[in-house]
Amino acid sequence: MQKALILCKAGFDGKNVEGAGVYTAAALARFGVSTAAAAKIDGDFSDIIREFFRKNGVDDSLIAEENDDNFNVSPDDFDAVFITGEFVLDNENSYYFAKKICEECRKLEIPVVFDPGNFGEKENVEIIRDFALKAEVFVPAIEDAKQLCGLTEPEKIADYFISLGVNKIVITLGKQGAFFKSRVESGEAPTFRADKVVDVTGAGDAFAAGLISGVIEKIPLSEAVVRANACGCCAIQSEGFSFPSIQELREYMLTHRFVVDGCKDY
């Protein structure tokens, strides 16, 4: 069975479990990928957060409580690792743990997918760039990518990061889909037409899950991005965080066409 490790930080806002990567883990598990979360969690809501992961088929045995920075995990049992900027920037121990995981993954030739998220302060830019170089696939949103390099056009941004040594980059463009580039292929992948737009909350998490599953399967980057776009479009058609199974996703991709101008109002 395919296995993925998610490094994320999880909290609870009084209504929902939250945190970058949390719902990506749930979406991957929905695809049938054996998914484990090495998460930092708010100790006050530990039971709620753990129950969320278990309910969604995510292994919670690697979770560390808020004041516990000791993660006992090795990536050698996994086919891919997903790291969020929120986890990396949480504290010094999280940073060094994520760095160690990246180094081990490189030795073991296990792909790392890194999503910087909204990394905030300018002093974090160098840290984010460093992890972009450590990852197999760097996945910034367009606005975050602009902040990282000062450029505005997706193709020029991608060229910039590839010139620095980034292996593969996928720049998410919202309703316009995504721009991708590696050393062997590049292009813009449009999104799919949505039958309806109900809630865009989980679109980014679904996109990441689709991309990671493609990386695990070792399909071309262009195909992985198309799958990721389809996942995002599926997710916005239901209330809350609703993710397709891999069978539902494949059916959706067969029955829906690309659109250049995005998923209607998405």
Where are the regions a protein language model picked out?
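Ribokinase/PfkB-type carbohydrate-kinase core domain
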Residues: M1-K9, A36, D42, E51-V137, ...
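N-terminal Rossmann-fold NAD(P) dinucleotide-binding loop
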Residues: G21, S46, A208
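Histidine-anchored nucleotide/phosphate-binding helix
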Residues: G21-R30, F97-E103
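Alpha-helix C-terminal capping segments
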Residues: N16, Y23-A36, G214-E217
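Active-site nucleophile and cofactor-binding loops and adjacent substrate-binding regions
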Residues: G14-A20, A64-E66
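Short active-site segment of divalent metal-dependent hydrolases/proteases
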Residues: F12, A145, F207-A208
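Conserved post-catalytic alpha-helical subdomain immediately downstream of the catalytic base
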Residues: R30, L164, F192-D261, D265-Y266
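Rossmann-fold NAD(P)-dependent oxidoreductase module
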Residues: A27, F52, E104, G210, ...
